[in-house]
Amino acid sequence: MKLVTIVIAAATTLIPIEAWADCDAQTGKQVYNKCVACHALEPGVHLMGPSLHGLFGRTAGDLEGFVYSGAMTNASFIWDQQTFGLFMEDPMQYLPGTTMPFAGIRKPEQREALGCYLAGLDDID
């Protein structure tokens, strides 16, 4: 099972930049202002929520150094464009039991822009 997770994670690390090639990262940076109080962008810097650095291609609830809710720890998905969009639309509906105190981002274009911004940061490293 671990090998399958590793293969899927490796395959999805290429998805964000290609999938968001024509997206609006500048708007995403503005949308990130809703996240900045709880999530840092620097690797290993955890606030109320985990660092968002390197999010895409990572297994949910598996970032070293952060204590996740049971729901997130037991989640079995890899962060990609689709899971990010669904989660950010309504975190508590997508993952019941999550402790992320955020109602979600209703506008699809804002979710896409935020994902684009975060994926672009991963590409800079």
Where on the chain are the PLM-derived regions?
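Sec-dependent signal peptide recognition
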Residues: 1-9
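Sequence/structural segment immediately N-terminal to covalent heme-attachment motifs in c-type
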Residues: 22-47, 52
